[in-house]
């Protein structure tokens, strides 16, 4: 608790400096971070190797080990994310709108940083960099609490970040990392209203629901991704196959990977044998409803427990549906509101799907894997929000700000 309180106080104090930093100063800090990540690459990869070995010794499944693992390419991606964020427009100080009253009083709505942000996340060390650079660019200090799986990796990365900040005008304490992995600290952290303006949990359902249900600090809920793809009867089946394979297998341990496949009954006999074979070639365990198993008998029977489950693994459940209406009803029942996709050549069905599906991202003829800050042009992201209030979808720079009213008068008084 002593470490937590001490570091929470530090990020609150540092925010008074950071929120008034210039764009040039913030960009310089992010550039230095990129340089230090490159300089400390070997040290970071060695720390990560230790984390990965420990995870495998504990029997962690490979899809989750993949989320933990770093390599030169992923370090390069972190550096590229820094460069991208440097190139993004600084949202702080933007005049959202303004107007002048009849009496000459001028009112403007101006974008400002939210304040010190607490990030609670699990096994992805790249989150440490992505959240830090977005927080800094948007004028927010950050208190990081990573999972025990990635402790060595995160310590090495944060050490590089803080070393970089020492060479800039940005306070080193703008980024603090909680090294104590005691889970009881999570409860303490999410109740530090005196020091934190926002808490963002990034992880599985258990972590997110715990933070949401117990926090007194406002929470930006990043969501579980039980994502669906519906193959309509009019879909180009040849083009549909690579979309489904991409959505399921590119990185199955991410929240924007497809977990469920819905197939129109009129194309099921033609399409299911093809897509099941292709999925299996990519190492996917295929589960299916009764109608699916009538067509492809050797798929694993799907149970009711499958439909709401986010696998985060090379597993997919298939359901045959009568039409777009049944597909929509199924998605409404089991969706987590993350990313949902329809593959179709029918404009009316596409329009209906987009209109009736309530999710952060709704796709027509595209993989759900695009729900990502970088892919959407936001640079890095701090998470994918599935809530409706304040921010939804990839949370980038603009979503890490709020606003205040600036009112300019000539000694006006209210009549």
Curated annotation (Swiss-Prot):
InterPro entries: Ald_DH/histidinol_DH, Ald_DH_C, Ald_DH_N, Aldehyde_DH_dom, G-glutamylP_reductase_CS, Glu-5-SA_DH, GPR_dom. It comes from the Bacteria. GO terms for biological process: L-proline biosynthetic process. One of its GO terms (cellular component) is cytoplasm. Its EC number is 1.2.1.41. The keyword Amino-acid biosynthesis applies. It is found in: Cytoplasm. GO terms for molecular function: glutamate-5-semialdehyde dehydrogenase activity; NADP binding. It catalyses: L-glutamate 5-semialdehyde + phosphate + NADP(+) = L-glutamyl 5-phosphate + NADPH + H(+). Catalyzes the NADPH-dependent reduction of L-glutamate 5-phosphate into L-glutamate 5-semialdehyde and phosphate. The product spontaneously undergoes cyclization to form 1-pyrroline-5-carboxylate. PANTHER family: DELTA-1-PYRROLINE-5-CARBOXYLATE SYNTHASE (PTHR11063:SF8), GLUTAMATE SEMIALDEHYDE DEHYDROGENASE (PTHR11063). This is Gamma-glutamyl phosphate reductase. It comes from Thermotoga maritima (strain ATCC 43589 / DSM 3109 / JCM 10099 / NBRC 100826 / MSB8). The lineage of its organism: Bacteria, Thermotogati, Thermotogota, Thermotogae, Thermotogales.
């Amino acid at each position: 608790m002593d470490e937590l309180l001490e570091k929470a106080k530090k990020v609150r104090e540092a925010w008074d400096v950071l929120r008034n930093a210039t764009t040039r100063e913030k960009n310089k800090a992010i550039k230095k971070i990129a340089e230090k990540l490159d300089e400390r690459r070997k040290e970071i990869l060695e720390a990560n190797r230790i984390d990965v070995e420990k995870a495998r010794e504990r029997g962690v499944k490979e899809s989750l080990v993949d989320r933990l693992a770093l390599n030169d390419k992923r370090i390069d991606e972190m550096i590229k994310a820094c460069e991208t964020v440097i190139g993004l427009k600084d949202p702080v100080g933007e005049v959202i709108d303004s107007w002048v009253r009849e009496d000459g009083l001028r009112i403007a709505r101006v974008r400002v940083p939210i304040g010190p942000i607490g990030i609670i996340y699990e096994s992805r060390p790249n989150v440490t960099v992505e959240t830090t650079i977005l927080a800094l660019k948007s004028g927010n200090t950050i208190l990081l609490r990573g999972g025990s799986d990635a402790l060595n990796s995160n310590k090495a990365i944060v050490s590089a970040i803080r070393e970089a900040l020492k060479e800039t005008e940005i306070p080193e304490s703008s980024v603090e990392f909680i090294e104590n992995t005691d889970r009881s600290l999570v409860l303490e952290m999410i109740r530090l209203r005196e020091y934190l303006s926002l808490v963002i949990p990034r992880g599985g359902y258990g972590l997110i629901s715990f933070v949401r249900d117990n926090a007194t600090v406002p929470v930006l809920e990043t969501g579980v991704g039980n994502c669906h793809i519906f193959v309509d009867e009019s879909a180009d089946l040849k083009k549909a196959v690579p979309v489904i394979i991409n959505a399921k297998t590119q990185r199955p341990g991410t929240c924007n990977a497809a977990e469920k496949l819905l197939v129109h009954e009129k194309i099921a006999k033609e399409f299911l044998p093809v897509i099941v074979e292709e999925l299996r070639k990519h190492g996917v365990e295929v589960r299916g409803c009764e109608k699916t198993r009538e067509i492809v008998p050797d798929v694993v029977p799907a149970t009711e427990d499958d439909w709401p489950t986010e696998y985060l693994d090379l597993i997919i459940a298939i359901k045959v549906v009568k039409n777009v209406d049944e597909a929509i009803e199924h998605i409404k029942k089991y969706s987590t509101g993350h990313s949902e996709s329809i593959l179709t050549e029918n404009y009316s069905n596409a329009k209906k799907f987009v209109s009736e599906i309530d999710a952060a991202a709704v796709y027509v003829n595209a993989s759900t894997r695009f729900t990502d800050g970088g892919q959407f042009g936001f640079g890095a992201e701090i998470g994918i929000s599935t809530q409706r209030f304040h921010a939804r979808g990839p949370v980038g720079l603009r979503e890490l700000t709020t606003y205040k009213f600036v009112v300019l008068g000539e000694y006006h008084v209210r009549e």
